[in-house]
């Protein structure tokens, strides 16, 4: 069977993305046919910063139509509008290749959201771009590994705005889309307030969550969704034995336990997108950029998922 062709967007070149590309290429090449969306010159510069530890000549690259950012010992680990613009163009090209079926999937390396903002990119991140590009699809950010998966009802929004987003109709649509994509038989849904609201004592959001769960189960014809569960105990070992699938109303409530347990091996997947996309579950790690310290397990797992 022919190996799948995977487009790999470079992420922010001032972070660990290029180190991950170089140190992982031999393993990645065994799983798929990687196409690195980056100018070869930048990979050469990255390898020089990594003391020429890796082979660069055999990597299949595609130049990006964007000015080359500076990459040297004084720029690494720093936010740059040029690097932000370049990482966005690399990602956008990956989506274009996937849309035209020139690649089978895309793997996105970490971007810096502030760099995108400085480059006047009108999207918070990868998932926000995908939601705008594919508006007819209920795209869901899910992170996890085989032991634990967490779908995020809200992702990169301020915590103070989440309460207003919790509406029965929107949550029912989300829950049904999550179940359809994952085919999960049981999904545990985290509550929003302390003690899942304590029957309305601590806010009304959890009452809406309960109604959405009931309506979703009724639509499915079986009790798929459990909850809302008090989030402080939802990820206890006995709860995780019930199912690996969870839904969280907010970003950190769901991802804090996931990353505490499985940070190195988890990946980020865009459910319900018309293209196949996966990513690492970590950021640019500016603090260890070009020090040969980056753990590549999450990146390799993302590639394996796509391949």
Curated annotation (Swiss-Prot):
Gene: pdxA
Location(s) in or outside the cell: Cytoplasm
GO BP: pyridoxal phosphate biosynthetic process; pyridoxine biosynthetic process
Reaction catalysis annotation: 4-(phosphooxy)-L-threonine + NAD(+) = 3-amino-2-oxopropyl phosphate + CO2 + NADH
Molecular functions (GO terms): 4-hydroxythreonine-4-phosphate dehydrogenase activity; cobalt ion binding; magnesium ion binding; NAD binding; zinc ion binding
Gene3D superfamilies: Isopropylmalate Dehydrogenase
Ligand binding (substrate): 126-127, 259, 268, 277
Cofactor: Zn(2+); Mg(2+); Co(2+)
InterPro entries recorded: PdxA_epsilonprot, PdxA_fam
Pathway: Cofactor biosynthesis; pyridoxine 5'-phosphate biosynthesis; pyridoxine 5'-phosphate from D-erythrose 4-phosphate: step 4/5
UniProt xrefs under SUPFAM superfamilies: Isocitrate/Isopropylmalate dehydrogenase-like
Enzyme Commission no: 1.1.1.262
Stated family: Belongs to the PdxA family.
Organism: Helicobacter pylori (strain G27)
A GO-annotated cellular component: cytoplasm
Protein name (database record): 4-hydroxythreonine-4-phosphate dehydrogenase
Pfam families membership: PdxA
Positions of a divalent metal cation binding: 156, 195, 251
HAMAP family: PdxA_Epsilonprot (MF_02086)
Misc. comment: The active site is located at the dimer interface.
Known function: Catalyzes the NAD(P)-dependent oxidation of 4-(phosphooxy)-L-threonine (HTP) into 2-amino-3-oxo-4-(phosphooxy)butyric acid which spontaneously decarboxylates to form 3-amino-2-oxopropyl phosphate (AHAP).
Broad enzyme group: oxidoreductase
Keyword terms: Cobalt, Cytoplasm, Magnesium, Metal-binding, NAD, NADP, Oxidoreductase, Pyridoxine biosynthesis, Zinc
Membrane-spanning residues: none
Subunit structure: Homodimer.
């Amino acid at each position: 069977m022919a190996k799948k062709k995977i487009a790999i967007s470079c992420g922010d070149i001032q972070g660990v993305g290029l180190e991950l590309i170089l140190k992982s290429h031999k393993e990645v090449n065994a799983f798929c046919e990687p196409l690195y969306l980056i100018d070869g010159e930048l990979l050469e510069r990255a390898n020089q910063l990594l003391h020429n530890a890796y082979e660069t000549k055999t990597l299949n690259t595609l130049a990006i139509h964007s000015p080359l950012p500076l990459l040297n010992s004084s720029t690494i680990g720093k936010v740059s509008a040029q690097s932000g613009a370049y990482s966005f163009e690399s990602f956008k090209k990956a989506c274009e290749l996937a849309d035209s079926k020139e690649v089978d999937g895309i793997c996105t390396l970490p971007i810096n959201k502030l760099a995108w903002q400085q480059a006047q990119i009108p999207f918070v991140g990868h998932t926000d771009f995908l939601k705008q590009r594919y508006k007819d699809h209920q795209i869901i950010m899910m992170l996890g590994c085989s032991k634990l998966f967490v779908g995020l009802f809200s992702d990169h929004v301020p915590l103070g705005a989440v309460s207003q987003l919790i509406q029965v109709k929107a949550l029912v649509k989300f829950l049904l889309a999550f179940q359809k994509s994952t085919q999960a038989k049981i999904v545990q849904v985290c509550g929003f307030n302390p003690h899942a609201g304590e029957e309305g004592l601590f806010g009304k959001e959890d009452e809406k969550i309960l109604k959405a769960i009931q309506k979703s189960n009724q639509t499915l014809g079986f009790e798929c969704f459990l909850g809302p569960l008090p989030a402080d105990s939802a990820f206890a070992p006995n709860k995780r034995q019930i199912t690996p699938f969870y839904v969280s109303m907010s970003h950190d409530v769901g991802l804090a336990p996931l990353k505490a347990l499985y940070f190195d091996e988890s990946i980020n997947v865009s459910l319900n997108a018309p293209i196949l996309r996966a990513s690492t579950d970590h950021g640019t790690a500016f603090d260890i950029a070009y020090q040969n310290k980056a753990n590549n397990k999450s990146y390799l797992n993302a590639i394996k998922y796509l391949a």
